Amino acid sequence: MISSTSLFAPVDPELRLLTDNLKRLISARHPILGAAAEHLFEAGGKRIRPAIVLLVSYATLLKEELTPRHQRLAEITEMIHTASLVHDDVVDEAALRRNVPTVNSLFDNRIAVLAGDFLFAQSSWYLANLENLEVVKLLSEVIRDFAEGEILQSINRFDTDLSLDAYLDKSYYKTASLIANSAKAAGVLSEVSSEMADSLYHYGRDLGLAFQIVDDILDFTTSTEILGKPAGSDLISGNITAPALYAMEEKPYLNTLIEREFSEVGDIEMALNLVKDSDGIWRSRELAAYHAKLAGKQLDCLKPSAAKASLLALTDYVLSRLY
């Protein structure tokens, strides 16, 4: 499997600064809010979203050093992403993320919601200080999309009439919007043409969709220890994703289990087995590969560089997580 460390080599110095800068940017007057926010950044993660911002910045600037505004955009992007995770964990009543206790399990839901709100507020403040109205609009749209995606997921729980298009819309709002709009924002700060900015947006959109589809596959195929959350947790909570949508076409009884919300003994195990015994996972892999390929084609607008090579390799990295 391709390692994220090698992929992000062109922006390694900037990523090393990221965590320290984030802790400084979110320092709060109240110690509990500060402790909750710091715990989030200590939990780690691959920092894929800020890395994409930094790589796009290098690929469009073609200079040896980034501007402070590009670096700050990467930090804002990670701040927004982290805030969304905090709220997700509250809504999902999750106790673990990446095998680390969530803020809501360490503190409580009230503190977790406030910590997420605080991060969104801080990101908005630093976003405004970039003094670029188009970038402000792009990242503000992301925050709106997060809320819309969460609402869609909530109202569509256990809905066996959910379409693939509706699933992809929700996946865009919850995952791809941030990657798409932050990639475009990096291009805007580099003063690229509107055509190139749109290509960067579509790169992020399709990469983000591929990333989410792969995550949804891993929810069925990966152990709890590796996944950092209970296997099959999406389906159990009524969140119907691509593997289950495809499996429902092939295994009609899965619809029955979902509609009765796994209320009988053995329903969950049977549902997970029906998904695994269908072509749902294979078809989802094909769907992820389709979007990853579309993402790669959007990079034709960029001149050759180490940063462009890493952005292109990311489309393979996303799929390599399946193997």
Show the residue positions of the predicted features.
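All-alpha prenyltransferase/terpene-synthase fold signal
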Residues: 1-323
